[in-house]
């Protein structure tokens, strides 16, 4: 007797979520850009004892760091990608990413940034305490995993 298709599909999704699929090169470059930008913002804020702002798509000026994305990577969450479980009941709806403000005390304005390339997506979640959570959406398994 053959197992039902839904059981096979669920088994396939479970196995696929455990495989170490690498990020596509444009999203890998974007992830590195985000991590470098955040690290630099925290470092500059602590060193100069003043607030630093990390902004998407803006020109860098004094006290402001600009984040540029590689070609093909776009801001926002695609419609067919669900919110991560940690944001499901947060009331977050999306839209353009707002600037992240980092203070010298290693605190930050809580914020969420989504970016995507095709069907793959990244979610950068920054808490008030300054802790960073970076998640990726894996379309094959339909789930968010730590990046």
Regions found by a protein language model. Name each.
Residues 2-147:
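N-terminal helix-rich module
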